[in-house]
Amino acid sequence: MEQLQAALGWDNDHLYMFQVGQTTWGEADPEWDGDDIPEDKTSLIEMLEDTGVRSFKYLYDFGDGWEHKIRIGKVANAVQGQLYPQVTSIEGRCPPEDIGGPPGYAYFLEVMADKQHPEYDEMMEIHGEPFDPNDIEADQIPERIKYFSQWLKKSKAKKSKLKIVKS
């Protein structure tokens, strides 16, 4: 999971869900009474192996509604010393968190492309730097994966043992 978040560029600030065929799996949302399989009951790898699918959807930040279609490429034997999974291609840069979903991102790009836009200075203050949607920042992915791996180890150690059971 942390490798996927890092590759996509998200900060892991929101709930997420995977959709493999008609089955959904992900982080439990206490406000949602859906049929999602809780993330602690199976793994994405197990779901993919059980269904045999070659692509799946990754839904992130239910409020903004980001939907990613992820295709599984060539599956080969592991090579000693290589880190897996590997990102083989990326199209475009990840939008900033909490930008308002696809419509908000489109507006953000419009504003950031025009330094004369009345909201340019405000967007620059919020984002903190110029934004190039074509700069995928591939050089940052290994560092992001390392960061998320360390962060998740710490956060999982602090999780409560309490489990929510549907009745």
Regions found by a protein language model. Give the residues of each.
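Short linear regulatory motifs enriched in tryptophan with gly/pro/ser
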Residues: 1-167
